[in-house]
């Protein structure tokens, strides 16, 4: 599949959920997201997990937005 983007993009995904951090739920979607982005020519460079705390979510998202071409949120 051809890339739709000029140059190489870098992406990050922010995974939100106390259940992920506690181990009650396993994150099975980041792998799918990484493959999909790769098919578009976008490299997933970071996946960050934060709990359900608004200030932590905002801080993490702002950090990812500043460092990558594309930031995705997975709740």
Model-identified regions with their sequence ranges:
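Glycine-rich phosphate/diphosphate-binding loop of Rossmann-like nucleotide-binding domains
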Residues: 8-40, 46-47
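Short beta->alpha junction loops
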Residues: 46-56
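Conserved small/polar residues in nucleotide/adenosyl-binding loops
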Residues: 74-75
